[in-house]
């Protein structure tokens, strides 16, 4: 799909791609630009809404400015920005398909008279002289400048399968943050584009089709938020997984009627349009492309899928319910500086955008104001709870909803993802000309604005709620004093006093109040290190508690952070006593679902045994599916009523983590700023302190991420525990009633049947009676998978702990050396470095002639607080080794280094103040492979070093402070030849168990496996199979007095499987490893050995000395298969030669014919 970017606001009117057109049902005119076939941009505020409305009509969280987008400069910026976002979408394969589909999805022509078809998707010029085909017009925002939406032209056509054109309101310049990342405007536009497809395809759900979304636990009344079905389908995310179930309990005729309506017009196209010569060929070609994609395909287009395809971060769960407790802030995007066709230039996290001037104009109409009052009714603090942007209802959906018996299995997810959209074919469709358009004048409804008017409710409480505690952790002051006394904080007039639950951190800050001032870099580093360590201990603490669902890692600070259970320090004890259900406020009884199960019709009473058996089995299967719908009714009630409350806690807890992180960072930054302005520390040291502090602030964010993950795990486990213990048991009880009734009716019916014997009746009863095993639907692992990773707020865009993963392999012309950590590492290396086979793959051969490899990326910088691990395989080829560098990251004699000395290795750490740690590792110069692991844990102030699977050093590094060095790691070979394999650096310490796992995993990977994944052994008897013919063993065939090897593909009973044995060149080896040199023998009356004949067939000989030695290796992708090679050629299976596929030595066959398996 080509996006036309050659426009500006002053482009001349050509009545083809640039025109002045009339708004529907109005006398408003505006300039439009066709940026893709049938897709237009109107750089104007949306004409259908007044730009000046009453205050009571303004929505909470909205921004209103009648002057926005009023000048030509602003309009041109809007045009260019929107084009760039469309180019970004088009730059991805699936994005290009989406735009192509919108381009082709013209509404079905209206049949004005029999055979007289007229177009409904058009714009008309000011003088009514020109018509322009339009499926979509993208406008600037309407009254509320931060509201994006898609609206239909004609409601009836948007729902009846005919389709109608669409208009979009869009704000490209303002975005907001979710957690730590900016929301990408491309995803915001994609959401509107998908919604437009529902209108263009005529498959829009009715406005009253909505589902309960979350229980509003912050209100005293029992109230739900409701989500429109179209938004539910488009949003994707975790909630969509509940729909991705067959069958799903929630049903409506929409999922039946929408495809039928669409198919009706598809059939009309085939019978009435396709061969109609009065309709322009371009229109028919567009319709032909449109009807290649059906309604089910559109249902599969959701934001989760596009975010994955575009690698865009987005909130994955409860999309519309995230901002209850804080006001969203907007940031300004500069499309020349911050954004290109790949998205934010520096990523969604690292990009820095300025706050918008409009933030001060955000409408503040909270859904609820919580007044915390004392015994004298004096208001101590006011806290706002904002709406979730959804309509609310007091109706109990579940009490009124009846689970249908005869419908509900029609909607299945098919995962087509626009496979039928052919972008190239669509690009070749000629444009629809002015003369091709016969307009239907009644193609639109008048646009009627809808205002979301919020009424603020107010409650008083003497018991502080979570929102009160959360508010007490936030301050705008730069002078900060932390206090763990909530009452003191809210009663104090001291604006610097802020509530904190970080007990260790507070105790440390209190303990140094009267110490000597911090006036040197060393004192600052000691202070900063202790702040970091105490923050980590406070924030990442968990305690294991036995619950009915097993051991649960509880986050003990949660009670103090949000006043949950009102228990202060006894949160753990109260949780043990009251269980996971105690964490939420509302514990409503599950509504027992209304069900309808058809009676067995009397018409079946006289059926034969065969027919009756078949009919009863069909009913049995249908009832079983119906039970599954009932199960999902219970699951959905838990999701909306219970899990929504746990998710609220997750959101608030994470907000609390970020609030505490902000407080600690402010304290650190204030201290550094003071030292920069008021100390006698040298400028060089201040510069180093500044760089080190930046890294420590990053490490603090990483600790916050660990805390967030702990919260996710704890509260999600608690929610699942409630489902398993409180909800599923009610489901079982309800099901027992259901099946007892069904079983009773089934028995009675079968007993009344007149055309079968008593034995046949007994057989049918046994076959069609339900037992408790038939409805065991609970799968805790599947339930856990709903929360596999979606709720974590990402701190870093790169989540892998690996900062370097060295790989090397041989290419035809050179050796490739690189990094597999996905950290954009820059690598420079000597071109004369050779590769040899190592422990598990190719290893670097550093021959001691000043060869080097240099790695650099943004993640290598060491500092004061970052933990890290280094591990690699080493084979030292030197003997009397003089001091020789091997690996290091040092600058100005600060950092870490590994070097050879005498007959061993030395690990050296030295900080910027000259504090040093040297650990000598002996016995690694014995010409053998060794696995070296070094773990630096700055929280425990511990250095661990392992050789192979043995811990050889456990040292304190308490005295080591800042080891800040450059972002370069060097791998050198000054004087000592050595092999290096698998050099890896992680941003975390390594445990003894992890070392053992890594060590033996690599060793295990070097072993060849048999067909059962067991290690292949020497001198053990096997049968041999080729991968392609996995059921046909290798046999011996005598031909011309020679014995050859082939598969038995003729079912010749005289051919028996041969018995193979692998013989090692090294008589002491038990197990076969990669690249071993082997001799293969075949057992029979006499032991024979494999040789290769002149025609390259494998033949058997009597003399072992004449046998060919073969190199054995495993396959990278199929672990229980292996390859055999001899003289640089692989052993494979030949194509069929008469009745035989021979084992031959040949490099010209298909890959899989080279794969073998010993059984």
Curated annotation (Swiss-Prot):
One of its GO terms (molecular function) is zinc ion binding. One of its GO terms (cellular component) is extracellular region. Pfam families: NTNH_C, Peptidase_M27, Toxin_BN_H, Toxin_R_bind_N. InterPro entries: Bot/tetX_LC (IPR000395), Clostridium_toxin_transloc (IPR036248), ConA-like_dom_sf (IPR013320), Nontoxic_nonhemagglutn_C (IPR013677), Toxin_rcpt-bd_N (IPR012928). Shorter forms of this protein are seen in vivo. Residues 796-1159 are annotated as: C-heavy chain nHC. Residues 1-375 are annotated as: Light chain nLC. GO terms for biological process: proteolysis. Keywords: Virulence. Coiled coil: none annotated. Gene3D superfamilies: 2.60.120.200, 2.80.10.50, Clostridium botulinum neurotoxin b, 'coiled-coil' domain, Metalloproteases ('zincins'), catalytic domain like. Part of a botulinum neurotoxin type A2 (BoNT) locus; may be part of a progenitor toxin complex required to protect BoNT during its passage through the host gastrointestinal tract. Belongs to the botulism non-toxic nonhemagglutinin family. Part of a crude toxin extract that includes BoNTA2/NTNH, P47, OrfX2 and OrfX3; OrfX1 was not detected. A purified toxin complex has NTNH and dichain BoNTA2. Forms a highly interlocked heterodimer with botulinum neurotoxin type A2 at pH 6.0, called the minimally functional progenitor toxin complex (M-PTC) (BoNT/A, botA). Has 3 domains that are structurally very similar to those in BoNT/A; light chain (nLC, equivalent to the light chain), N-heavy chain (nHN) and C-heavy chain (nHC). This is Non-toxic nonhemagglutinin type A. It comes from Clostridium botulinum (strain Kyoto / Type A2). The lineage of its organism: Bacteria, Bacillati, Bacillota, Clostridia, Eubacteriales.
């Amino acid at each position: 799909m080509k996006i036309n970017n050659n426009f500006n606001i002053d482009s001349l009117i050509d009545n083809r791609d640039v025109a002045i057109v009339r708004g529907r049902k109005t006398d408003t005119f505006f300039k439009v630009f066709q940026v893709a076939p049938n897709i237009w941009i109107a750089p104007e505020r949306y004409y259908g809404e007044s730009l000046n409305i009453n205050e009571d009509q303004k929505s909470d969280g909205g921004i209103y400015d009648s002057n926005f987008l009023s000048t030509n400069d602003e309009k041109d910026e809007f045009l260019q920005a929107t084009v760039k976002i469309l180019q970004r979408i088009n730059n991805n394969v699936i994005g290009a398909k989406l735009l192509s589909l919108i381009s082709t999805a013209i509404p079905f022509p209206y049949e004005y008279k029999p055979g007289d078809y007229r177009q409904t998707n058009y714009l008309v010029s000011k003088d009514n002289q020109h018509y322009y085909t339009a499926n979509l017009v993208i406008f600037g925002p309407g009254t509320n400048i931060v509201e994006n939406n898609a609206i239909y032209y004609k409601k009836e056509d948007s729902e009846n399968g005919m389709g109608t054109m669409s208009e979009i309101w869009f704000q490209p310049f303002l975005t907001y943050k979710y957690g730590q990342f900016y929301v990408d405007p491309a995803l915001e536009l994609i959401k509107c584009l998908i919604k437009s497809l529902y209108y263009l395809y005529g498959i829009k759900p009715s406005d009253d089709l909505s589902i309960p979304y979350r229980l509003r636990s912050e209100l005293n009344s029992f109230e739900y938020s409701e989500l429109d079905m179209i938004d539910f389908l488009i949003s994707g995310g975790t909630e969509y997984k509940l729909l991705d179930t067959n069958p799903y309990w929630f049903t409506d005729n929409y999922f039946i009627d929408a495809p039928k309506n669409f198919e009706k017009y598809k059939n009309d196209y085939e019978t009435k349009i396709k061969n109609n010569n009065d309709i322009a060929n371009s229109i028919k070609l567009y319709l032909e492309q449109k009807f290649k994609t059906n309604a089910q395909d559109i249902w599969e287009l959701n934001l989760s899928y596009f975010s994955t395809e575009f690698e865009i971060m987005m909130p994955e769960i409860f999309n519309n319910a995230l901002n209850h407790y804080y006001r969203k802030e907007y940031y300004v995007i500069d499309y020349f500086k911050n954004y290109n066709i790949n998205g934010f230039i520096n990523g969604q996290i690292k990009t820095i955008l300025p706050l918008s001037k409009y933030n001060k104009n955000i409408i503040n109409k909270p859904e609820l104001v919580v007044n915390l009052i004392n015994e004298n009714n004096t208001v101590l603090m006011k806290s706002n709870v904002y709406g979730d942007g959804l309509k609310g209802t007091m109706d109990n959906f579940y009490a009124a909803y009846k689970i249908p018996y005869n419908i509900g299995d029609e909607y299945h997810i098919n995962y087509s993802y626009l496979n039928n959209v052919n972008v190239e074919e669509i690009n070749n469709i000629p444009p629809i000309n002015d003369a091709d358009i016969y307009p239907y004048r009644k193609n639109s409804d008048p646009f009627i604005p809808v205002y979301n008017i919020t009424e603020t409710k107010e409650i008083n409480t003497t018991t502080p709620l979570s929102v009160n505690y959360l508010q007490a952790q936030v301050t705008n002051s730069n002078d900060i004093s932390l206090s763990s006394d909530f009452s003191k904080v809210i009663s104090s007039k001291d604006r610097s006093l802020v509530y904190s639950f970080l007990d260790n951190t507070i105790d440390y800050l209190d303990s140094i109040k009267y110490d000597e001032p911090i006036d040197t870099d060393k004192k600052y580093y000691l202070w900063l290190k202790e702040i970091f360590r105490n923050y980590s201990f406070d924030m990442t603490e968990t305690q294991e508690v036995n619950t009915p669902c097993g051991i649960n890692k509880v986050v003990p600070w949660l009670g103090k952070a949000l006043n949950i259970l009102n228990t202060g320090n006894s949160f753990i004890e109260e949780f043990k006593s009251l269980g996971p259900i105690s964490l939420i406020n509302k514990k409503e009884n599950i509504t027992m679902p209304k069900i309808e199960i058809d009676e067995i019709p009397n018409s079946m009473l006289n059926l034969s045994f065969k027919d009756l058996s078949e009919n009863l089995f069909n009913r049995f299967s249908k009832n079983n599916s119906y039970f599954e719908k009932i199960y999902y009714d219970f699951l959905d009630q838990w999701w909306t009523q219970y899990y929504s409350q746990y998710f609220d806690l997750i959101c608030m807890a994470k907000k609390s983590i970020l609030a505490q992180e902000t407080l600690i960072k402010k304290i650190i930054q204030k201290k550094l700023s003071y030292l920069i302005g008021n100390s006698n520390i040298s400028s060089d040291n201040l510069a180093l302190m500044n760089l080190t502090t930046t890294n420590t602030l990053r490490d603090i964010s990483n600790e916050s991420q660990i805390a967030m993950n702990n919260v996710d795990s704890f509260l999600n486990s608690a929610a699942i525990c409630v489902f398993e213990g409180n909800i599923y048991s009610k489901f079982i009880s309800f099901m027992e009633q259901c099946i007892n009734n069904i079983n009773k009716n089934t028995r009675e019916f079968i007993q009344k049947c007149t055309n079968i014997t008593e034995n046949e009746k007994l057989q049918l009863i046994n076959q069609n009676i339900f037992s408790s095993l038939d409805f065991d639907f609970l799968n805790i692992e599947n339930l856990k998978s709903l929360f596999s990773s979606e709720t974590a707020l990402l701190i870093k865009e790169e989540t892998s702990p690996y900062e370097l993963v060295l790989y090397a392999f041989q290419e035809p012309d050179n050796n490739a050396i690189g990094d597999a950590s996905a950290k954009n590492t820059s690598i420079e290396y000597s071109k004369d470095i050779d590769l040899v086979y190592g422990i598990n793959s190719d290893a670097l051969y550093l021959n001691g002639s000043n060869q080097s490899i240099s790695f650099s990326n943004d993640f290598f910088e060491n500092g004061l607080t970052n933990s890290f691990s280094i591990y690699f395989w080493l084979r030292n080829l030197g003997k009397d080794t003089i001091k020789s560098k091997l690996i290091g990251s040092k600058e100005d004699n600060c950092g870490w280094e590994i070097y050879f000395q005498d007959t061993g290795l030395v690990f050296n750490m030295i900080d910027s103040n000259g504090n040093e740690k040297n650990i000598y590792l002996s016995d690694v110069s014995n010409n053998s492979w060794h696995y070296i692991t070094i773990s630096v844990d700055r929280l425990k102030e511990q250095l661990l070093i392992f050789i192979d699977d043995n811990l050889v050093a456990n040292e304190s590094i308490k005295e080591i402070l800042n080891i800040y060095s450059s972002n370069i790691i060097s791998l050198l070979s000054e004087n000592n030849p050595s092999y290096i394999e698998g050099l890896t650096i992680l941003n975390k310490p390594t445990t003894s168990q992890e070392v053992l796992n890594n060590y033996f995993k690599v060793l295990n990977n070097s072993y060849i496996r048999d067909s059962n994944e067991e290690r292949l052994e020497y001198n053990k008897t096997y049968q041999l199979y080729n991968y392609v013919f996995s059921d046909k063993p290798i046999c011996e065939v005598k031909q011309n007095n020679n014995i050859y090897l082939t598969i038995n593909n003729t079912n010749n009973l005289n051919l028996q499987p041969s018995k193979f044995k692998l013989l090692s060149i090294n008589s002491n080896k038990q197990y076969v490893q990669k690249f071993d040199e082997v001799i293969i023998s075949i057992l029979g009356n006499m032991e024979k050995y494999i040789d290769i004949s002149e025609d390259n067939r494998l033949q058997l000989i009597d003399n072992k000395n004449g046998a060919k030695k073969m190199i054995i290796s495993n396959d990278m992708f199929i672990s229980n298969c292996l390859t055999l090679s001899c003289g640089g050629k692989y052993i494979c299976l030949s194509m069929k030669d008469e009745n035989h596929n021979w084992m031959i030595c040949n490099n010209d066959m298909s890959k899989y014919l080279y794969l073998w398996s010993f059984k």
